[in-house]
Amino acid sequence: MASSEVFTSEEAAQRAIKTYYESQESRMGYELVFGGTQHFGYYTPGTWSPFPIDKSLRRMEEKLMGWLALPAGSRILEAGCGVGHVALYLAKHGMRVTGVDIIDHHVEQARRSAQKANLPKDQIVIEKMDFERLEAIPSASHDGAFTMQSLGHAFSAEKALAGFFRVLKPGGRFALVEVERRPNAEADKKNPRLTEQLSMINVGTGMPTNERSHDGFYKGLLEEAGFVDIESRDISDNILPVVRMFYVVLLVPYLFVRLLGIEKHFVSMLAGTAGYVGYDRWRFMVVTGRKP
């Protein structure tokens, strides 16, 4: 399904994104479960318990540094930086980070956190900016760039990738850590309601790119943008403990919300349950590449 079939315009997509991240359900959920961080944690396959969650989050950020494979002092762009937790982790480990986001309270909180960290002035810079419109960032100005569960919000992922490619220096590294859909016509026939729920999640969270993704989608984006040395990793098993936890915790309240017919107004709750039930309908991918 193309982005235009989910959202009538880029403006509509951005309204959905802002509505989601400004909702109390979203803000309280991220704060209570992840301490404000907006990405999954990384676990050893076979792990059952998701606790302690904060250690798994930092482990994912450590893994990201490995996937970027850049030396200390590198200038890195984070597209969709949220409240700045990933940017801060990288900055505290010697990277110089430019974080961009379109949500006002994200930008404000990220800037406050950066100030409290007492890092050198240019170690971390947070800007309010749409990562599909990076014209204010000079070409060939960054050694690396990445998205951490944010590229799914793009109205045009192709436009976003072209921008990332432009701002990277020759030899610059790019990494994305994203949910990739796995369309299955047979599964859709067996459980059409689940298919509808998964699309409802993408609409409610403002994720047109996630809705149109499919097996190999992100790898294809990097190839089309001009990246080389592309590698793909499926790390779905590494996030399973927290996906399972969401299902266990949210199932009963979700059933109540569903009974009332108001599930579209509780999209985070829907994502926490349908995401686990439909675990075979998506995978969690890391795709990396280099600008030649």
UniProtKB/Swiss-Prot annotation:
EC id: 2.1.-.-
Chief place where the protein resides: membrane
GO biological process: ergosterol biosynthetic process; ilicicolin H biosynthetic process
Ranges that cross the membrane: 240-262
Pfam family, one: Methyltransf_11
Superkingdom of origin: Eukaryota
Bilayer disposition of the protein: Single-pass membrane protein
Keyword annotations: Membrane, Transferase, Transmembrane, Transmembrane helix
Catalysis performed (reactions): 3-[(2E,4E,8S,10E,12Z)-4,8-dimethyltetradeca-2,4,10,12-tetraenoyl]-4-hydroxy-5-(4-hydroxyphenyl)-1,2-dihydropyridin-2-one = 8-epi-ilicicolin H
Protein's cellular compartments: Membrane
Pathway: Mycotoxin biosynthesis
Gene Ontology MF: a single term: cyclase activity
Cofactor: S-adenosyl-L-methionine
Annotated GO CC locations: endoplasmic reticulum; membrane
Keyword Ligase attached: no
Family classification: Belongs to the class I-like SAM-binding methyltransferase superfamily. Erg6/SMT family.
Function in brief: S-adenosyl-l-methionine-dependent Diels-Alderase; part of the gene cluster that mediates the biosynthesis of ilicicolin H, a 4-hydroxy-2-pyridonealkaloid that has potent and broad antifungal activities by inhibiting the mitochondrial respiration chain. IccD catalyzes the Diels-Alder reaction that converts the acyclic 2-pyridone intermediate to 8-epi-ilicicolin H. The biosynthesis of ilicicolin H starts with formation of the tetramic acid by the hybrid PKS-NRPS synthetase iccA with the partnering trans-enoyl reductase iccB since iccA lacks a designated enoylreductase (ER) domain.
Protein's name according to its UniProt entry: S-adenosyl-L-methionine-dependent Diels-Alderase iccD
